[in-house]
Amino acid sequence: QIEDLKDKVNQFLAQAKAEGTLDEMYDRWVSRAEGTMPEISMPRTPDCKLRVGTTGMVQPFSYYEGTTLTGYDVELIYRFGAWLNAEVEIKIYDYDGIIAAAQAGDIDCIMANLNATEERRKHIAFSDCVYPSVTAVMVRASQDGNAQSGEKYETLSDFEGARFAALSGGVYDKLLQEVI
């Protein structure tokens, strides 16, 4: 177990943010969707081992390109490992198992596009924010096929009576149940 890991993650994030690394990564992986993993020099004689859980199923954050795990979160894992002077071991879990793995001590931390909800905060500690999350609602095009000529929605109450799809148990599922 790595002592003061949350503090170390937050120190790393603050430094990476100040240097512009997080913005560059977000621009490359998310905004431009280029999906290019840079070479990251890992330590030859690490001081510790960092076991990180991720999902491997959410592009552009953590996904497989053929048999190679890649993405924003994966790059972040390796950058943090290099900063920490650690050997990195990545373990893949689905969303149902990843928090349980952290609680059981199978992994030291999670880097997996995971929203910090009050329910999750009861079970695990969260670092400072890694990147901003922007949410939008997609609507079906109108009968004439033109999305611009359809109904206009300006507030959540405008969606009353509409049908939605959201990840069951996710942060937006809860929001929809509370608001609409």
What is each PLM-predicted segment?
Residues 7, 24, 100, 173-174:
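Alpha-helical elements of the RecA-like P-loop NTPase motor core of helicases
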Residues 4-89:
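N-terminal hydrophobic or amphipathic helices and topogenic motifs
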Residues 4-7, 59-64, 119, 145-148, ...:
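Short, solvent-exposed loop/turn elements at domain surfaces
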Residues 180:
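Helix-loop-beta element that forms the nucleotide-linked donor phosphate-binding surface
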Residues 1, 43, 74, 78, ...:
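Acidic, polar ligand-binding/catalytic clefts
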Residues 1-9, 113, 163-166:
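Short intrinsically disordered, low-complexity coil segments enriched in acidic
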Residues 46-56, 152-173:
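Short loop->beta-strand "edge-of-pocket" segments that line small-molecule binding or catalytic clefts
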